C-alpha cells in the first residue's frame, strides 16, 4: 500500500465500536471523507471529479444540522476499494472551487453523520476560525456572533 492510501491518524470519536473494529472498518472501507470543501461546491462537481477514479456509488453532502445547507464536507462511496484508493492517491490535495480538498478514509456512512457537529450546526473547525474565508461562510460562526450587531430590541 502506498503512503498516500494509508490510514491517517484521525479517528472519529463518535464511532460505535472498539478501536480495533474502527481500524478494520477503515482498512476495508470503500467510503471516503472529503473535507475543506467550499460551502458552494455542488454534488455534481464532486461527482465529476471523483468519478474519474471509478464508479461512484453514492455522495452524501455534509449539511448544517439546523439550516440544512452545505457546510464544507461530504462522503463519497465507491463500489470497490481499489477505486477509492485511486481517489485517495489522485484527488487528495487537488483543487476544487479554488480550495485544496482533503480526502481521508471513512469507516462507512451512517445516517446522521451528514450533519455538522458544531454547536451552531456546522463543522467545529468553522466555529473557532478567526480568519475570513468567503468559501466557508465568512468569519468563524462564534466570532460572527460576537461581532454581529444586537438586533434584539427587547
Swiss-Prot record:
It comes from the Eukaryota. PROSITE patterns: RRM. It is found in: Nucleus. Pfam families: RRM_1. SUPFAM superfamilies: RNA-binding domain, RBD. Residues 30-108 form the RRM domain. GO terms for cellular component: nuclear cap binding complex; nucleus; presynaptic cytosol. MRNA binds at residues 10, 33, 102-106, 113-117, 123-124. InterPro entries: NCBP2, NCBP2_RRM, Nucleotide-bd_a/b_plait_sf, RBD_domain_sf, RRM_dom. One of its GO terms (biological process) is primary miRNA processing. One of its GO terms (molecular function) is RNA cap binding. Keywords: mRNA processing, mRNA splicing, Nucleus, RNA-binding, RNA-mediated gene silencing. Component of the cap-binding complex (CBC), which binds co-transcriptionally to the 5' cap of pre-mRNAs and is involved in various processes such as pre-mRNA splicing and RNA-mediated gene silencing (RNAi). The CBC complex is involved in miRNA-mediated RNA interference via its interaction with Ars2 and is required for primary microRNAs (miRNAs) processing. Also involved in innate immunity via the short interfering RNAs (siRNAs) processing machinery by restricting the viral RNA production. Component of the nuclear cap-binding complex (CBC), a heterodimer composed of Cbp80 and Cbp20 that interacts with m7GpppG-capped RNA. Interacts with Ars2. Belongs to the RRM NCBP2 family. This is Nuclear cap-binding protein subunit 2. The gene is Cbp20.
